[in-house]
């Protein structure tokens, strides 16, 4: 009888601490959704109740990653998302260089406006519309930080604190929202840039202008999204800048060292490697016998090559594709190359190369014979390589990958290349250097041990702070900063400094004229 009472008491206590969480993760990208899936499942294991709006993502190995749970209500907006996103990707091919490279020149308001329209369409999904009309209440709203449109949820569920979570780096706009140091062309560069090192004075000036252009592009994008929200939901809807004031916490899924240890207030929490937590298990980590045999028999070493889930070898121009093929032909190692089966037939693939549409990446990287990881520089791939102690050769293609690869060289964990100009000779030289030079391996192991020396694992931190925001009904008051959402003119105290300068100049000018 006492045991029954104890069990019932524990059940009541657990449910009394449970919170209701509304999540919206709109980007139909496997690398994004992998992070959010791990976070959602961790909250479910804690007994919390979640409503999740997202497009279901299927990868090559297994289906949708969310585990069915009685406390989970999923609203799958894939029917209004996936084809839309495919068209966006198809349209973006026009501006790509060498068939696959999207540098900072492609980061424009027009290109990202399509993403906002896609999310606007998600809000027209019938189940989402019913949710917005309902009288449901939530303790916390958690939304993807990459885009601003989901902030509209804070208008419908008023007085509910918002947490933004990024699958990788935070944007400059995210940091402005939190009152953190957001823009500095040298120390805290915009993650959308593609040039960071070895710059001449003139090149540095050009990068400053790139920073200014990006600021103007995304400011206009915010204005466009504000107008879209008012057309969709009515003229009383606040603009994006006002909705950002409802954000109480931000999770950034990178290690602070990869953000140059940016000064941030306490309501910005860096995670980094959330999806490689020991509590996370997945069928994606399984390895078949043929692959195991290939790895075991590769006594000279293995080079693992994956340019991410959104890059297809068939999109490369013939010159770029030949650079990879000739490099693999000339190195003494065996190669695992992740290439989609629907890609063009490679009649001249060297005999030392094994091609598959998918590999269990974490297991492959942890094999003792893997010497180098040739990667596009994505955040999740970088985390997995560091966790496995494998040095990297970065071939950046888009977004924050240029910055991530720059950090490889900064911390001595690998090397990078200019994807627009690289040839087979240079690619071969760098592969051999990273494979043979122990300093890259040692640098990776050192960095891994340093970033893992923390009082709390990333996933535990994300869950704890989510519960903290729910318990305290927000976090801005005690963890935030007064600098949050402040304009640059106010932050720099122009209203005080400009009159002072004018007064000083006028006084000086009067003295000059009176002489």
Curated annotation (Swiss-Prot):
Signal peptide limits: 1-31
Function: Catalyzes the transfer of glucose from UDP-glucose to ecdysteroids which are insect molting hormones. Expression of egt interferes with normal insect development and block molting.
Keywords: Glycosyltransferase, Signal, Transferase
UniProt name for this protein: Ecdysteroid UDP-glucosyltransferase
Sequence similarity: Belongs to the UDP-glycosyltransferase family.
Keyword Transferase: yes
Broadest EC class assigned to this enzyme: transferase
Gene that this sequence comes from: EGT
SUPFAM superfamilies: UDP-Glycosyltransferase/glycogen phosphorylase (SSF53756)
EC number(s) per entry: 2.4.1.-
GO MF entries: UDP-glycosyltransferase activity
Organism field: Spodoptera littoralis nuclear polyhedrosis virus
PROSITE patterns: UDPGT
């Amino acid at each position: 009888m006492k045991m029954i009472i104890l069990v019932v008491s524990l059940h009541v206590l657990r449910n009394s601490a449970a919170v209701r969480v509304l999540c919206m993760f709109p980007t139909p990208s496997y690398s994004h959704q992998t992070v959010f899936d791990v976070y959602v499942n961790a909250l479910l294991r804690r007994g919390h109740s979640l409503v999740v709006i997202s497009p279901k993502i299927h990868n090559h190995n297994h289906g949708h990653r969310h585990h069915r749970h009685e406390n989970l209500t999923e609203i799958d907006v894939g029917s209004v998302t996936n084809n839309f996103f495919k068209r966006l990707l198809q349209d973006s091919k026009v501006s790509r260089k060498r068939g696959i490279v999207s540098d900072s020149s492609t980061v424009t308001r027009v290109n990202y406006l399509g993403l906002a329209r896609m999310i606007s369409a998600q809000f027209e999904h019938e189940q989402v519309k019913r949710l917005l009309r309902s009288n449901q209440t939530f303790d916390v709203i958690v939304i993807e930080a990459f885009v601003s449109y989901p902030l509209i949820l804070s208008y419908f569920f008023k007085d509910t604190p918002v947490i933004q979570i990024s699958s990788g780096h935070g944007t400059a706009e995210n940091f402005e929202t939190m009152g953190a140091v957001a823009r500095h062309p040298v120390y805290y560069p915009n993650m959308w840039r593609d040039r960071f090192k070895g710059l001449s004075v003139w090149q540095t000036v050009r990068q400053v202008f790139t920073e200014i252009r990006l600021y103007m592009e995304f400011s206009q994008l915010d204005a466009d999204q504000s107008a879209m929200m008012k057309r969709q939901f009515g003229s009383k809807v606040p603009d994006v800048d006002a909705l950002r004031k409802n954000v109480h916490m931000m999770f950034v899924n990178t290690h602070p060292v990869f953000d140059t240890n940016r000064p941030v207030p306490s309501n910005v929490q860096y995670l980094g490697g959330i999806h490689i937590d020991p509590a996370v298990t997945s069928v994606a980590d399984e390895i078949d016998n043929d692959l195991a045999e290939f790895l075991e028999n590769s006594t000279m070493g293995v080079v693992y090559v994956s340019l991410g889930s959104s890059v297809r070898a068939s999109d490369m121009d013939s010159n770029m594709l030949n650079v990879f093929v000739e490099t693999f032909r000339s190195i003494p190692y065996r190669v695992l190359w992740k290439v989609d089966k629907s890609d063009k037939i490679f009649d001249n693939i060297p005999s030392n190369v094994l091609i598959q549409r998918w590999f269990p990446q974490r297991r492959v990287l942890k094999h003792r014979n893997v010497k180098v990881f040739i990667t596009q520089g994505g955040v999740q791939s970088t985390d997995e390589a560091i966790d496995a102690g494998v040095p990297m050769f970065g071939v950046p293609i888009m977004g924050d990958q240029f910055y991530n690869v720059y950090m490889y060289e900064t911390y001595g964990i690998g090397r990078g290349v200019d994807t627009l100009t690289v040839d087979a000779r240079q690619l071969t030289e760098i592969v051999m250097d990273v494979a043979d030079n122990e300093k890259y391996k040692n640098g990776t192991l050192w960095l891994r041990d340093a970033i893992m020396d923390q009082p709390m694992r990333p996933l535990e931190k994300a869950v704890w702070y989510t519960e903290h925001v729910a318990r305290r009904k927000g976090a801005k008051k005690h963890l935030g900063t007064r600098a949050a959402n402040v304009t640059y003119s106010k932050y720099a105290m122009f209203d005080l400094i400009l009159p002072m300068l004018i007064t000083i100049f006028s006084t000086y000018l009067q003295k000059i004229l009176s002489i």
